[in-house]
């Protein structure tokens, strides 16, 4: 199979990368009705599989799980996930032939074998669904021409898909129809109904393409969403402990600080996050973030270039063929980091203290969001896609760190995201250790500025505020957040 994106000419590539339209709520007036009375069979019952299925069932759909016979016989975790939640479970041969919509929610590296196994069993005119287009775009999977191929891609880990649904909301979702596979012209109706059944329409859906979803998703998860949180946690913890900060306090400031800081980001963008700081702290965070952007821009651009060219995909697939040797090795190394093993503490940290004592963390968030957004848009991905894959999804990933540190983040994201995260962090950590962290102290990470006066130069503050507020990610963010008035606030801090 050939990389689908690389078979397109430049005009077609740019057209597919630029597909992204925010859909009006009126387009979801019938919600999930198009799929009611039809049989939905999900293949795979991991984080995305289980949680999407729970939402879809609660939305009135007929949902079953098809698993490999070995998973059923051995009662593996996927079988337990489905059975313990009251779902009908069967083998491919039992469930696939009667399914109207087969949704493949297995890990990326299993997609080719899974699709090759289920496609001969699918009835004429059925639909095949994905939540990530890697198999279509990067592996070039060819689907039988009578089958409609759609995508519904929630912009967060599977656990958060469920949590946001239970809060009465949802998560922003990209939907798409593969242009090579829409024989009956019903792809968009299927995708809209599926998205509504997960609750995505409440947060906002983007009519996109498989190509735009894959390229933007890979970039976001590798850099700001996961890679920067991992690198930042590791180097900031090391710095604080080396400079005499109590290890328990240092670890807690980071583990729960990312969530607290990015919760402000979710509701008011970088502007609001920076406004939570005093004026002197805001200027300091701005200066640090500008330095970080200069230092890390080449790394962000390299990741974007490798994603667009297909180099990242081929590298990761080579590791698949090597039994994930690199992935498992990097996972084990992460488990041994000092941050992952910090001693728990009962110390209370107030919400504002996370901002006051986490100035460097705020600088890292601003720098990372803007760098990822800039790299994506410079490559032809439009602002809406770049916003969701850089800024909006960040609080959802930070929530996972708050639960069980980096372990939880890497468990709930896909193996593809985890692999890309390590590629980024493995370069970012030594880069920051050598070029940046020796120049900072506990005034920006651990203790705060400790200044008595908030007096600053007016001209400097005006210039800083103007630069922050006039970045393109802030313009598109304000527009898109206007569609998400129902976002639920989560409890942060102690």
UniProtKB/Swiss-Prot annotation:
GO terms for cellular component: cytosol. Residues 14-208 form the KARI N-terminal Rossmann domain. Residues 209-344, 345-487 form the KARI C-terminal knotted domain. It comes from Vibrio cholerae serotype O1 (strain ATCC 39315 / El Tor Inaba N16961). Binds 2 magnesium ions per subunit. This is Ketol-acid reductoisomerase (NADP(+)). Keywords: Amino-acid biosynthesis, Branched-chain amino acid biosynthesis, Magnesium, Metal-binding, NADP, Oxidoreductase, Repeat. Its cofactor is Mg(2+). It comes from the Bacteria. Its EC number is 1.1.1.86.
């Amino acid at each position: 199979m050939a990389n689908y994106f690389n078979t397109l000419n430049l005009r077609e590539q740019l057209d597919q990368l630029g597909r992204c339209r925010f859909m009006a709520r009126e387009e979801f007036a019938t919600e999930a009705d198009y799929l009611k009375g039809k049989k939905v069979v999900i293949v795979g019952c991991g984080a995305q599989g289980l949680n999407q299925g729970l939402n879809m069932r609660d939305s009135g759909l007929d949902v079953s799980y098809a698993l490999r016979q070995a998973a059923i016989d051995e009662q593996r975790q996927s079988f337990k996930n489905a059975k313990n939640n009251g779902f009908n479970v069967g083998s491919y041969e039992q469930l696939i032939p009667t399914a109207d919509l087969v949704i493949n929610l297995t890990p990326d590296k299993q997609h080719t074998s899974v699709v090759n196994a289920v496609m001969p069993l699918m009835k004429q005119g059925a639909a095949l669904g994905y939540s990530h287009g890697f198999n279509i775009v990067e592996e070039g999977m060819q689907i039988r021409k009578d089958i409609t191929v759609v995508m519904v891609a929630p912009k967060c880990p599977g656990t958060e898909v469920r949590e946001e649904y239970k809060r009465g909301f949802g998560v922003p979702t990209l939907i798409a129809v593969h242009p090579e596979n829409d024989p009956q012209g019903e792809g968009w109706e299927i995708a809209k109904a599926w998205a509504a059944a997960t609750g995505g329409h409440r947060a906002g859906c983007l009519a996109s393409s498989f190509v735009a979803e894959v390229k933007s998703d890979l970039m976001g998860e590798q850099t700001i969403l996961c890679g920067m949180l991992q690198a930042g946690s590791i180097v900031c913890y090391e710095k604080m402990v080396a400079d005499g900060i109590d290890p328990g306090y240092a670890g807690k400031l980071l583990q729960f600080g990312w969530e607290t800081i990015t919760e402000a980001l979710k509701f008011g963008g970088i502007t609001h996050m920076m406004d939570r700081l005093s004026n002197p702290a805001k200027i300091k965070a701005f200066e640090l973030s500008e330095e970080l952007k200069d230092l890390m821009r080449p790394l962000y651009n390299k990741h974007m270039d490798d994603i667009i060219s297909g180099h990242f995909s081929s590298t990761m697939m080579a590791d698949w063929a090597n039994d994930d040797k690199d992935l498992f090795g990097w996972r084990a190394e992460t488990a041994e980091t000092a941050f992952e093993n910090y001693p728990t503490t009962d110390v209370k940290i107030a919400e504002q203290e996370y901002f006051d004592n986490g100035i460097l963390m705020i600088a890292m968030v601003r720098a990372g969001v803007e760098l990822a957004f800039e790299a994506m848009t410079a490559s032809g991905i439009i602002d809406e896609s770049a916003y969701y894959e850089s800024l909006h999804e960040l609080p959802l990933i930070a929530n996972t760190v708050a639960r069980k540190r980096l372990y939880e983040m890497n468990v709930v994201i896909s193996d593809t995201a985890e692999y890309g995260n390590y590629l980024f962090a493995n370069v970012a950590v030594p880069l920051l250790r050598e070029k940046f962290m020796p120049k900072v102290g506990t005034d920006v990470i651990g203790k705060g500025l400790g200044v008595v006066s908030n007096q600053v130069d007016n001209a400097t503050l005006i210039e800083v505020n103007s630069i922050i507020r006039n970045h393109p990610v802030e313009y598109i963010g304000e527009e898109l957040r206007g569609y998400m008035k129902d976002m639920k606030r989560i409890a942060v801090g102690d």
